[in-house]
Each structure stands twice: as C-alpha cells, then as structure tokens.
Curated annotation (Swiss-Prot):
Task of the protein: Tetrapolymerization of the monopyrrole PBG into the hydroxymethylbilane pre-uroporphyrinogen in several discrete steps.
Reaction equations catalysed: 4 porphobilinogen + H2O = hydroxymethylbilane + 4 NH4(+)
NCBIfam families according to UniProt: hemC
UniProt modified residues of type S-(dipyrrolylmethanemethyl)cysteine: 241
Organism of derivation: Geobacter sulfurreducens (strain ATCC 51573 / DSM 12127 / PCA)
GO cellular component annotations of the record: cytoplasm
HAMAP family linked to this entry: Porphobil_deam (MF_00260)
Miscellaneous: The porphobilinogen subunits are added to the dipyrromethane group.
Protein name: Porphobilinogen deaminase
Gene that produces this protein: hemC
Length: 318
C-alpha cells in the first residue's frame, strides 16, 4: 500500500537538492496525490569547507546527521550520492535501492587544453585522493591542488585560483546542466571512478516495510550489482570515501567485470586488477578482488596511507 506522505532527508547543496527533487518528482509521478516533503540537513562535510576531506577524517562525513534524523523519526528516506555512503550503517538503517547510474567518468575542465596536452607542472584542482594518485602515476610533474565546495564553486576555482584544470564527477555536471564547460571526459582506464560514482542510493529504516515497498521501483538491478561489488571491495580494504581506492563494475548480461585500484597518495606505488564472474556473486567478487589487490602490494600501501595495519583477514558479516 502506497503511503500518503513521505519525508526525504537531503543535504542542502545544489546537487543534493537536484537529486532529492528528482526522487520527489518520480514518486509524485508514480503515486499521484502523495505529499512529498524535502527536509534539508547540514552535515559535518558541509560545515568544514576549509580543510581537505582526507584530513577531516572519519567515515560518513556527508550522511551521519541525515541518518541521525532518520533514527529520530524526522525523515522517512534519505537520498545519497553513492560515492559518499559508508560501507556500514547504523543499526536499523540500510540501503534499499540503488538507482540507474549516470555517467561514471571524471570530467576534465580546462581552458580548452586536453589532459594529454597539459604543460609541464600544470596545476590541477581536485577533491579526491584517488584522482590525484591516478593522474600523478602517469604525470608525476603535475601539481595537485585540493579544492572543496559545491559544483559551481569548483568550476569557478579554475579562474579564481589560476588553475590549469579542475576535475569533477561527470554525473553531477550532467545533472546540473554544466556539460558545456567540460573539455573532455577522462576514460576509466586513466581515471577509474570512485566507488558508486554516478549512482544514487536510497536509505531507510529497515523495519519500515511500507516505505520499502513504496520506493522499491527506484532500484536498478545492473547498477545495484555493480555498485555492491565496488562497495564490497571498499569494505574489505577498510576504506572510506577519502582514500586512494577506486573501483568500477560493469554488467553485461549475467556477467560482472570489476576493476579495482589502490595507490599511494603520490601515485608512485599502485596496484590494479580485474575480476569477472556471475552478477549474483557481486559481493563475493568484490571481496575476492580486494584480497588480490591487498596480496599484490595493496596491503602495504594502505597500511602507510592509514598509518595503521589493515586486517589480513576480515569476517564477512552475515
């Protein structure tokens, strides 16, 4: 039975509101007469804008306060960018839908110069350590500048901070209609995307069957299998969204191919591997690929990045 009213928790950034409004619109189309309310919530990641996310530390910088509101019963569902969602949830909450993925690639924005034609020592603005590591691996001469802020702010920094280029997720630019500023889209073999990049996740209270049934139509099976594989890899590597780990899954028929990457922040040491198997084994494939990456040098790289040991073995939760 469809609900009469649904409250959506969301961050207040332009992109987060676009995403939440898209979910609202789809709900209203499917359930005419349903009252859908957006509840804006400020997260710690929104409040701390002058420090790189990797230095803020911790997991769930963009979801914790939203989850707390859900546990208090103030909202019914939350809409997240999947790349911001930690691999573990507070008791009673969970990810119940993963939407069809928008373009998962990274977008390169410059004054018309492609990545291949960047001058020596060019300054590149990015918010992600995984982008930094991958691009320094092929161009160690580049100077990486960590930038924060919403999509428009980051685009402006190209001019304001006299940068040669900035790199953002293509999905956000496409959703907000900023594709005209993109110089090129970086191929995934150059810049492997963040875990879950381009997909949205819908979280709710696991015991709220009415809500679960109401939002179930958002789930896109191929995207869900790919993203679950990526997240299983991240979980096994004990990574948050601010470590130099990347993974991208692609589904073809009943088969899933997953590529994973672990690197030191400066890109001097890295390991990259792929694995294929049935989509029904998506999480097992993610964990198997993580084990392979860790065994081939990823363990030592991450121990240095985290400045602590990474588990040699990790119990899979039931």
């Amino acid at each position: 039975m469809a609900l009469n009213r649904l409250r959506i928790g969301t961050r207040a950034s332009q992109l987060a509101l676009w995403q939440a409004n898209w979910v609202k619109s789809e709900l209203e189309k499917r359930y005419p007469g349903m009252e859908v309310e957006l509840v804006k919530i400020k997260t710690i990641g929104d409040k701390i804008l002058d420090v790189p996310l990797a230095q803020v530390g911790g997991k769930g910088l963009f979801v914790k306060e939203i989850e707390e509101a859900m546990l208090r019963g103030e909202i019914d569902i939350a809409v997240h960018s999947m790349k911001d969602v930690p691999t573990e949830f507070p008791e009673g909450l969970g990810l119940v839908c993963i939407t069809e993925r928008e373009d998962p690639r990274d977008a390169f924005i410059s004054n018309g110069v492609t990545f291949a034609n960047l001058p020596q020592g060019a300054k590149i603005g990015t918010s992600a350590l995984r982008r930094q590591a991958q691009l320094l691996k092929v161009r160690p001469d580049l100077e990486m500048v960590i930038i924060r802020g919403n999509v428009e702010t980051r685009i402006r920094k190209l001019t304001e901070d006299k940068l040669d280029a900035v790199i953002l997720a293509a999905a956000g630019l496409k959703r907000l209609g900023f594709t005209d500023v993109v110089t090129e889209y970086l191929p995934v073999d150059l810049s492997l995307p963040a875990i879950g990049q381009g997909a949205l996740g819908l979280e709710c209270r696991l015991d709220d069957q009415a809500v679960r049934e109401t939002i179930d139509f958002f789930n896109h099976p191929d995207t869900a299998h790919a993203v679950r594989a990526e997240r299983a890899l991240l979980w096994r590597c004990e990574g948050g969204c601010q470590v130099p780990i990347a993974a991208h899954g692609q589904v073809s028929g009943d088969s899933l191919t997953l590529t994973g990457f672990i690197a030191s922040v400066d890109g001097t040491r890295s390991v990259k591997e792929s694995i294929s198997g049935p989509v029904t084994d998506c999480e097992k494939l993610g964990i198997a690929l993580a084990e392979k990456l860790l065994a081939d040098g990823g363990h030592e790289i991450l121990a240095e990045v985290y400045q602590r040991e990474v588990s040699r073995e990790k119990e899979i939760p039931v």
